[in-house]
């Protein structure tokens, strides 16, 4: 008994001495500038709720204001979760070039855990997952490759002509640019994917699909107590996971109906000419055993959820800035007119060759990025260091693209709409800025492994839509409104949109 007591006492003494030695070494490493780093600075968190009360207003603007006080690499406590916010081009460069692999996972919003969605979606699967690599390869090879997009160029041109054709019927009247363009973009995407218009059609399932996807994204974009306090997830106190699960079930049912009918058509009529759309390609992959059948449904949902908002919102912001800046409007319309000569038709290749138009597109994406806050990253390993601060494993990393692309250290007159800034880049000896995330002051589509896979479609379709609208119509503000009267207030919801939808009057300048 005495021996046991002695051993326990010696063990306790050894444990205490080891702990004291560890604390001494740790203190000395901090004092001597060792590699044990602190978290970035940030606003003082309140008990339990952290910094949640600091985040009112427009989210990306609020984060930018906080960064001006606490620095371009900043810590926020969001309830019981820790986030590091990156707000400068230099900090973004360091994060993406040195730690892209360690930051290649995503934190999953609790609402998207419904129906196992997060486990099958390319958006939330970690890049180390073989499933993610397979899906990424499908996007790159069968959906957004130059060859695949070129094959469906005629469909995109036809759908953009449909937009122009509809606007001709209301020429001279005030119209909501967002609504008209959104319908056209939905049809462009849906016809490219499965040869069906999703807007202004008689199909109840088509209209229902559009509305449900919008509801799902709006629900997930809202604040959820389960994301701030993970121990409450099981309770789903706001019911957002249940609501999302219900909507996802309906959407997947509608998509599955479209897919199953096509698969039955392919099976029952093997000699019938195929549609030549993306759905045909995906069904071929599933039939060959290269992807499971359910991946087709998830791929279609991911593209619809992200694609329509991105293209519509960029067109609206670009049109708003052109109406607000008559000099730029006149210059880009002159380029379009001169390039076409006396031709009345306009195609996607024409838009790609117009230098100033491309500058307008890039500047609209810089000043008003649709994803003002990029889809957050998650540190999956220790060892991440940004700006001299530690980003521990399990930390959410938020890239404020809106702040990065207005960083005064990287941009001259960053808050002004100046397409010429990209023109000057083209004419200088340095390489022109591109959309693909290699220029870290300009990341509207993200960067690294998680670069938006739909970028190739957007960079073709958006300038083409813009050029078509500018070629076919002279655009004016409603009666009595001057450019200075325009409301350019942002609203951050599912995307960074105009708080007041743009209203404008198209006046026909060409006939088809």
UniProtKB/Swiss-Prot annotation:
PROSITE patterns reported in the protein's UniProt record: CYTOCHROME_P450
Subcellular location: Membrane
SUPFAM superfamilies in the record: Cytochrome P450 (SSF48264)
Enzyme class, spelled out: oxidoreductase
Function: Enzyme of the diterpenoid metabolism involved in the biosynthesis of the oryzalexin class of phytoalexins. Can use ent-sandaracopimaradien and syn-stemodene as substrates, but no activity with syn-stemoden-19-oic acid. Hydroxylates 3-alpha-hydroxy-ent-sandaracopimaradiene at C-9-beta, resulting in a 3-alpha,9-beta-diol corresponding to oryzalexins E.
EC number(s) from the headed UniProt entry: 1.14.14.122
Swiss-Prot/TrEMBL catalytic activity: ent-sandaracopimaradien-3beta-ol + reduced [NADPH--hemoprotein reductase] + O2 = oryzalexin E + oxidized [NADPH--hemoprotein reductase] + H2O + H(+)
Domain of life the protein comes from: Eukaryota
A Gene Ontology cellular-component term: membrane
Membrane topology value: Single-pass membrane protein
GO molecular function: 3alpha-hydroxy-ent-sandaracopimardiene 9-beta-monooxygenase activity; heme binding; iron ion binding; monooxygenase activity; oxidoreductase activity, acting on paired donors, with incorporation or reduction of molecular oxygen, NAD(P)H as one donor, and incorporation of one atom of oxygen
Induction data: Up-regulated by methyl jasmonate.
Cofactor(s) the protein requires to work: heme
Database matches in CDD domains: CYP76-like
Name used for this protein in its record: Oryzalexin E synthase
Cited InterPro entries: Cyt_P450, Cyt_P450_CS, Cyt_P450_E_grp-I, Cyt_P450_sf
Residues involved in heme binding: 452
Keywords, comma-separated and alphabetical: Heme, Iron, Membrane, Metal-binding, Monooxygenase, Oxidoreductase, Plant defense, Transmembrane, Transmembrane helix
Residues spanning the membrane: 6-26
GO BP, sorted A to Z: defense response; diterpene phytoalexin biosynthetic process
Listed Gene3D superfamilies: Cytochrome P450
């Amino acid at each position: 008994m005495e021996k046991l007591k002695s051993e326990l006492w010696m063990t306790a003494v050894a444990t205490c001495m080891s702990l004291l030695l560890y604390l001494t070494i740790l203190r000395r490493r901090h004092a001597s500038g060792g590699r044990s780093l602190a978290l970035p600075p940030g606003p003082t968190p309140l008990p339990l709720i952290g910094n949640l009360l600091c985040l009112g207003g427009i989210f990306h603007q609020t984060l930018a204001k906080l960064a001006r006080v606490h620095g371009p690499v900043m810590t926020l406590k969001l309830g019981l979760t820790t986030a590091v916010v990156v707000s400068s081009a230099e900090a973004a460069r360091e994060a993406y070039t040195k730690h892209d692999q360690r930051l290649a996972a995503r934190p999953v919003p609790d609402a998207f855990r419904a129906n196992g969605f997060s486990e099958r979606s390319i958006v939330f699967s970690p890049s180390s997952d073989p499933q993610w690599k397979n899906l990424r390869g499908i996007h790159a090879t069968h959906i957004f490759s130059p060859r695949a997009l070129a094959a469906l160029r005629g469909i995109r041109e036809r759908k953009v002509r449909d937009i122009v054709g509809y606007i001709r019927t209301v020429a001279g009247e005030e119209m909501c640019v967002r609504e008209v363009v959104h319908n056209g973009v939905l049809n462009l995407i849906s016809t490219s994917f499965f040869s069906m218009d999703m807007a202004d059609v008689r199909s109840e399932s088509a209209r229902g699909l559009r509305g449900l996807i919008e509801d799902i994204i709006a629900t997930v974009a809202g604040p959820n107590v389960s994301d701030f306090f993970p121990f409450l997830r099981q309770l789903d106190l706001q019911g957002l996971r249940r609501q999302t699960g219900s909507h996802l079930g309906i959407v997947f049912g509608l998509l599955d109906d479209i897919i199953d009918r096509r698969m039955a058509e392919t099976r029952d009529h093997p000699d019938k000419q195929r549609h030549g759309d993306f759905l045909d390609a995906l069904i071929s992959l599933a039939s060959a055993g290269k992807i499971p059948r359910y991946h087709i449904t998830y791929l279609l949902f991911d593209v619809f959820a992200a694609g329509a908002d991105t293209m519509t919102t960029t067109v609206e912001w670009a049109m708003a800035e052109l109406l607000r800046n008559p000099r730029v409007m006149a210059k880009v319309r002159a380029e379009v007119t001169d390039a076409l000569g006396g031709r009345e038709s306009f195609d996607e290749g024409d838009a790609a060759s117009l230098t100033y138009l491309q500058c307008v597109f890039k500047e609209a994406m810089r000043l008003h990025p649709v994803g003002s806050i990029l889809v957050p990253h998650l540190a999956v390993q220790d060892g991440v260091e940004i700006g001299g601060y530690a980003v521990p494993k399990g930390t959410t990393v938020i890239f404020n693209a809106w702040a990065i692309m207005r960083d005064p250290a990287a941009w001259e007159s960053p808050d002004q709409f100046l397409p010429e800034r990209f023109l000057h880049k083209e004419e200088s000896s340095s390489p022109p800025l591109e959309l693909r995330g290699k220029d870290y002051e300009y990341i509207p589509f993200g960067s690294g492994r998680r670069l938006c896979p739909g970028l190739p479609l957007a960079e073709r379709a958006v300038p083409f839509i813009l050029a078509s609208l500018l070629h076919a119509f002279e655009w004016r503000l409603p009666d009595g409104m001057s450019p200075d009267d325009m409301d350019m207030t942002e609203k951050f919801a599912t995307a960074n949109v105009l708080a007041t939808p743009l209203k404008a009057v198209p006046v026909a300048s060409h006939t088809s």
